[in-house]
């Protein structure tokens, strides 16, 4: 995971391999523009089981173009960049302070050395393969600059150490399990904000209806209490007891953007509230539910922490039962009105022609919750489609609440699901529509624009599986169906 300053733990899953023929001990994310150079790869010791940071030291022999007139450094750098002679390596700055000393002893750390004498001149690191003592390795551009006495090519040793080598996101396969504790230490080193590194020992939800997982601690404390920030909201929970996936942050934001102030939303499988709580901040009335008792507790605490309790009401029920329960209670209950006060900006108060405004004026808005839902959100991809039969006859005998009798439309349903990862998107859409139709008892097809149908790919879960979101208007034939 990549929750740099928020989620205080890191996890490793076990579905995808490291790059072929590489050791997990030495995998690095640094890339060289000219090629994937072995010179910049980390040293390899496949026998290492306990992390030895001192082992990861390496001297890379390069060359540097020392510039005689530092006023011309910009133009010379541009020339070398255009001729592809400049070293372009991730995290390494090519502009260095030139140093006095024997030609063979000009050395600097990858991050730039802070000790030693400097003569005020600068040098530019040159790409791998250019040798100071071999003119045949020089490009025409370098030869021209040397002949013009603009630069001097000198040897330059670049020191790499443990701090230089970073890592790419990886999944831990069985053949790398002997390295798991060593990898845990490396991950903690490379993510200073991380308190704990874990390895998932089974698939999410394989042993729990609450989409949790078993894990082992690879480094740090066995403490899974985390704090996450998303969409200006704060969530605190035990990561081992609820489902959370930061990679869905964009999807959370996209869905919440569909909700409008004053609308009513039924979040059937709400979790800790990544849809519900940001919606509450938008002054959307949310009936939020989660089957997990601990998830429900976190949802309630999150609503209080983010000051949206007036708009977000948490429940702990089975999702199918909740669809009917929430619909009935919303219709039969007394209309809920929230008085929302917004502070008038100082500039607006001062510029207002109405001088009767007090120094600290507030605008007051009254928001009344509708008696029917505008949206149903069902975020349980593995099984959410199976709950769609709860919408059969949901508004039976209540036609007068909707168009054409009023300006209210039947609700939009947003159901998340998995499907196979196919090169033919039409097959994916057809499969999802068939599954939805079976549970609704009403045929929906990919071409059914009248239902405001949208089937959108959310993310690739594995090489063979995708996550989708299907949104459609609840058909009147389903909503008003009599038993």
UniProtKB/Swiss-Prot annotation:
Record has Methyltransferase as a keyword: yes
SUPFAM superfamilies, alphabetized: S-adenosyl-L-methionine-dependent methyltransferases
EC number: 2.1.1.228
Enzyme class at the top of the EC tree: transferase
Record's compositionally biased regions (Low complexity): 9-24
Residues that hold S-adenosyl-L-methionine according to the record: 252, 290-291, 379
Subcellular location as annotated: Mitochondrion matrix; Nucleus; Cytoplasm
Region ranges (Disordered): 1-24
Catalytic activity: guanosine(37) in tRNA + S-adenosyl-L-methionine = N(1)-methylguanosine(37) in tRNA + S-adenosyl-L-homocysteine + H(+)
Gene Ontology biological process terms from the UniProt entry: mitochondrial tRNA methylation; tRNA N1-guanine methylation
Record bears the keyword tRNA processing: yes
Lineage top rank: taxon: Eukaryota
Pfam families from the UniProt entry: TRM5-TYW2_MTfase, TYW2_N_2
A single GO molecular function term of this UniProt record: tRNA (guanine(37)-N1)-methyltransferase activity
Alphabetical list of Gene3D superfamilies matching this protein: Met-10+ protein-like domains (3.30.300.110), Vaccinia Virus protein VP39 (3.40.50.150)
A GO CC annotation given for this chain: nucleus
UniProt keyword list: Cytoplasm, Methyltransferase, Mitochondrion, Nucleus, S-adenosyl-L-methionine, Transferase, tRNA processing
Database matches in InterPro entries: MeTrfase_TRM5/TYW2, SAM-dependent_MTases_sf, TRM5-TYW2-like_MTfase, TRM5/TYW2-like_N, tRNA_Gua_MeTrfase_euk
Subunit structure and binding partners: Monomer.
Described function: Specifically methylates the N1 position of guanosine-37 in various cytoplasmic and mitochondrial tRNAs. Methylation is not dependent on the nature of the nucleoside 5' of the target nucleoside. This is the first step in the biosynthesis of wybutosine (yW), a modified base adjacent to the anticodon of tRNAs and required for accurate decoding.
Family designation: Belongs to the class I-like SAM-binding methyltransferase superfamily. TRM5/TYW2 family.
Protein name, per record: tRNA (guanine(37)-N(1))-methyltransferase
Organism of provenance: Ajellomyces capsulatus (strain G186AR / H82 / ATCC MYA-2454 / RMSCC 2432) (Darling's disease fungus)
């Amino acid at each position: 995971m990549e929750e740099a300053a928020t989620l205080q733990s890191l996890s490793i899953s076990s579905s995808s391999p490291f790059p072929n023929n590489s050791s997990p001990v030495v995998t690095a994310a640094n890339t060289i523009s000219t090629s994937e150079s072995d010179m910049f790869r980390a040293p390899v010791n496949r026998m290492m089981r306990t992390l030895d940071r001192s082992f990861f030291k390496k001297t890379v022999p390069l060359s540097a173009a020392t510039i005689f007139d530092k006023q011309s450094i910009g133009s010379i750098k541009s020339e070398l960049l255009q001729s592809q002679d400049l070293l372009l390596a991730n995290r390494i700055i090519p502009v260095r302070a030139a140093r006095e000393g024997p030609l063979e002893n000009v050395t600097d750390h990858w991050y730039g050395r802070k000790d030693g004498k400097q003569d005020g001149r600068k040098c530019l690191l040159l790409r791998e393969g250019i040798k100071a003592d071999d003119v045949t390795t020089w490009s025409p551009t370098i030869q021209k600059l040397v002949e013009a006495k603009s630069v001097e090519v000198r040897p330059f040793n670049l020191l790499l150490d443990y701090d230089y080598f970073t890592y790419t996101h990886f999944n831990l396969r069985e053949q790398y399990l002997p390295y798991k504790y060593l990898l845990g230490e490396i991950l903690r080193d490379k993510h200073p904000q991380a308190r704990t590194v874990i390895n998932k020992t089974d698939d999410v939800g394989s042993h729990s209806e609450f989409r949790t997982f078993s894990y082992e601690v690879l480094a740090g404390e066995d403490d899974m209490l985390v704090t996450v920030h998303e969409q200006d909201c704060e969530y605190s929970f035990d990561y081992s007891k609820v489902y959370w996936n930061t990679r869905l942050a964009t999807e959370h934001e996209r869905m919440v953007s569909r909700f409008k102030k004053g609308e009513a939303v039924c979040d059937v499988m709400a979790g800790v509230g990544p849809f519900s709580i940001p919606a509450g901040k938008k002054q959307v009335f949310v009936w939020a539910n989660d089957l997990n008792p601990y998830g429900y507790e976190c949802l309630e605490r999150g609503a209080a922490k983010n000051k949206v309790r007036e708009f977000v009401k948490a429940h702990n029920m089975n999702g199918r039962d909740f669809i009917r329960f929430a619909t009935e209670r919303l219709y039969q209950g007394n209309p809920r009105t929230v008085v929302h006060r917004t502070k008038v900006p100082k500039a607006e108060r001062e510029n207002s022609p109405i001088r009767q405004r007090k120094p600290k004026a507030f605008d007051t808005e009254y928001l009344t919750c509708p008696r029917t839902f505008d949206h149903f959100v069902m975020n349980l991809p593995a099984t959410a489609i199976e709950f769609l039969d709860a919408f059969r006859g949901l508004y039976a005998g209540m036609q007068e609440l909707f168009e054409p009798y009023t300006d209210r439309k039947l609700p939009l349903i947003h159901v998340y699901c998995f499907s196979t990862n196919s090169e033919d998107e039409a097959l994916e859409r057809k499969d999802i529509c068939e599954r939805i139709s079976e549970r609704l008892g009403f045929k929906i097809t990919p071409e059914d624009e009248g239902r405001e149908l949208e089937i959108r790919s959310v993310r690739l879960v594995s090489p063979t599986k995708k996550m989708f979101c299907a949104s459609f208007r609840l058909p009147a034939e389903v909503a008003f169906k009599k038993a």
